[in-house]
């Protein structure tokens, strides 16, 4: 019998390789390979992994149509040609220029999909199912939107560093206009032209201000975007700071994505919840002993000792006092009272497979910064399929309370206003009112319910 290496040498085309690999697979391995999104959906209904849902089926049909369109698609970038001369004399004679107009040029690429609806309706499940069906698209990625934007900001920083001395217009001290999102978009599109974004949300002004130029360039490169969100595109960055500068991005998104509303009124994450729980209420049980017992069990499965650990990220040290292998035993103060951001939580989610969080208080708008960090933390851990054990002051459904509101802005909010040169009229922006946190808490509670399930705890190994 020929070895796999010899067999591969006999094959010329990618299609033949796929056929050969299928011949070498067992029927069980093939059961979910080479299926279309609709076939995969119906198979999951038949196996009772999913419950029949008319809204989900309608969205799956739209994904099926896109899947068929992408079979014969190859991206063809459309770029603006620049006519300015190069070399010494070209740079010497350059006149002072305004920033070039950034507009959609590539309208031949298939439109992607923007799937929005309430929490737990199956948006991410359907997108992941679609993604897994696209086996014959090598240049693809599935990414949480916060992680994607963290990478984008890192690439922008790198591009600016590598650019070197900036060209200046003739007889002017001003540097010539430079758009770092263009080379960043080219790098991203060269790596992946099918991009599936989970939890497309915009809460950060630094993200909001670059999305129009970034995605215009990405779409001009020919990328196809699939996104899930809890908000309609028109409601993204609602009441955000300087939203007027963000609104043009909504037009770009609507131009290149079909919008699918997906709201069946059912939160499937809460259905058939396991009897076991990894959420302990301090007033109802000896939560401290329960958490310590869980930590000892988890440590027994690690090849390490209990010790502090430091993660270095972008030149910054992030130290945790109690870890064992890939298990982190932490508390709310260590994770949410410190000024940590999305990129820090991404590092935690990628380094640890299990995180214990002690002493989570009831979260009110008096703790708005900590509330925002906790929401970001849970989103990131969920996306990385990290297992979570929590001890909290109140039951899960009471974890967020919006009855108590601060009378004055916190010091860090005042600092933000000073940095952006904002006046008192801007205090109604969502970053100050807590509107985004109020909108996001349903998703966080829903995910915490799912993260207690046995099925969730058993699947983490697949993502490592």
UniProtKB/Swiss-Prot annotation:
Signal peptide (UniProt feature, chain positions): none
NCBIfam families: ZapE
PANTHER family referenced in this protein's UniProt entry, alphabetically: AFG1-LIKE ATPASE, ATPASE N2B
Keywords: ATP-binding, Nucleotide-binding
Gene Ontology CC: mitochondrion
The name this protein goes by in its record: Putative ATPase N2B
Keyword Nucleotide-binding part of the UniProt annotation: yes
GO molecular function: ATP binding; ATP hydrolysis activity
């Amino acid at each position: 019998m020929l070895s796999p290496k010899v067999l591969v040498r006999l094959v010329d085309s990618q299609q033949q390789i796929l056929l050969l690999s299928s011949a070498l697979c067992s029927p069980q391995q093939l059961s979910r390979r080479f299926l279309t999104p609709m076939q995969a959906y119906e198979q999951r209904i038949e196996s009772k992994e999913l419950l029949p849902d008319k809204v989900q089926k309608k969205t799956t049909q739209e994904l099926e149509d896109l899947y068929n369109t992408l079979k014969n698609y190859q991206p063809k970038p459309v770029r603006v040609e620049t006519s300015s001369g190069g070399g010494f004399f070209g740079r010497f004679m350059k006149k002072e220029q305004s920033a070039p107009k950034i507009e959609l040029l590539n309208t031949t690429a298939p439109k992607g999909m923007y799937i929005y609806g309430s929490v737990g309706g199956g948006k991410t499940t359907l997108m992941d199912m679609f993604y897994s069906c696209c086996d014959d698209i090598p240049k693809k990625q599935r990414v949480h939107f916060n992680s994607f934007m963290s990478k984008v900001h890192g690439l922008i920083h790198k591009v600016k560093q590598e650019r070197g001395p900036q060209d200046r217009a003739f007889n002017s001290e001003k540097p010539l206009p430079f758009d770092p999102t263009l080379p960043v978009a080219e790098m991203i599109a060269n790596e992946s032209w099918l991009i599936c974004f989970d939890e497309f949300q915009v809460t950060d002004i630094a993200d909001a201000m670059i999305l129009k130029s970034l995605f215009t360039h990405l779409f001009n490169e020919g990328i196809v975007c699939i996104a899930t969100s809890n908000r309609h595109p028109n409601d993204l960055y609602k009441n955000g700071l300087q939203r007027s500068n963000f609104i043009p991005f909504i037009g770009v998104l609507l131009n290149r994505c079909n919008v699918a509303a997906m709201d069946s009124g059912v939160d499937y994450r809460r259905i058939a919840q396991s009897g076991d729980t990894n959420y302990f209420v301090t007033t109802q049980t000896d939560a401290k002993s329960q958490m310590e017992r869980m930590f000892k069990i988890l440590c027994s499965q690690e090849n390490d000792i209990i010790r502090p650990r430091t993660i270095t990220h972008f030149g910054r040290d992030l130290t945790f006092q109690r870890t064992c292998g890939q298990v982190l035993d932490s508390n709310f103060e260590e994770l949410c009272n410190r000024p940590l951001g999305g990129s820090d939580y991404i590092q935690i989610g990628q380094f640890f497979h299990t995180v214990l969080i002690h002493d989570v208080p009831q979260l009110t708008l008096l703790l708005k910064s900590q509330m925002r960090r906790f929401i970001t933390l849970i989103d990131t851990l969920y996306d990385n399929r990290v297992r979570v054990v929590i001890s909290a002051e109140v039951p899960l459904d009471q974890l967020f309370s919006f009855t108590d509101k601060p009378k004055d802005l916190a010091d860090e909010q005042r600092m933000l206003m000073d940095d952006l040169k904002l006046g008192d009229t801007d205090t109604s922006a969502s970053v100050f009112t807590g509107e985004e946190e109020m909108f996001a808490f349903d998703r966080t509670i829903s995910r915490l319910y799912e993260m207690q399930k046995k099925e969730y705890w058993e699947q983490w190994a697949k993502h490592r």
